[in-house]
Amino acid sequence: MANIHPLATVHPNAKLGENVEVGPYAYIEEHVEIGDGSKILPHATIFNYVKMGKNCTVFPGAVIGAIPQDLKFDGEVTYVEIGDNVNIRECATINRGTKASGRGVTKIGNNVLLMSYTHVAHDCCVGNNCILVSYVGIAGETDVDDWATIGGSSVAHQFSRIGKHAFIGGGCKINKDVPPYILCGRDPLTYAGVNIVGLRRRGFTSDQIRNIKDMYDIIYNSGNNVSDALAKIESGFLQSEERDVIIDFIRNSKRGIIRGMGSDSKGSID
């Protein structure tokens, strides 16, 4: 059974799993589900229509499930869905979705770290194993794919997409889509090479990393336009997950991808 501090406010119809801990002055509304082993620390707030997985921790001052900051919201029932093993640090905020977006739900995957004062707006989708560093804000309907990291105080424009395994430096303005597997920084946001360290940590081989680098050299450093670059990649590289992820991401980009800096990426692959 759940362990609820007598000074916490928990609606009797809220569904709390086994061994859930709720600290003093935490506030949990009626239409909330919290998975086994999760901890809701003092002064955390969880509003209606939130479903949280197992072994999550919500730190003091965090607010989950507040209505979206969207003028199109008309009081409809929308949701926040959070996976397992998610850490939501001090004063982070996650808003519900809106039906006007066509989504109606804000999603956080498994094994995600939202550091202090991060903001996840309505209808965003944050994938598995992502890190949003302190003071990051992602606007409505932003998609952050698996294993992406966004550096502190960076902000993402509405409808942006950040590719898997991408690493974005601190203090950046994200107003274009960030392709998978890359490093980027500066203002305006600029391609700065392949995320070699991150890919190694996740078990990518030297050959895989080299192929990724060679593909981005064609995209950013060869003078090709995007369509020609993708055609050369499709015809010049054997089929692989990495090749297909890069091609599909760029072809489906609605905002266009970030610019290149006109020089080779740094770092040793071997």
Give residue spans per PLM region:
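Terminal amphipathic alpha-helical/low-complexity segments used for targeting or macromolecular assembly
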Residues: 1-7, 12-13, 18-19, 55, ...
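Structural signal for interior beta-strand "rungs" in well-ordered beta-sheet cores
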Residues: 3-185, 189-190
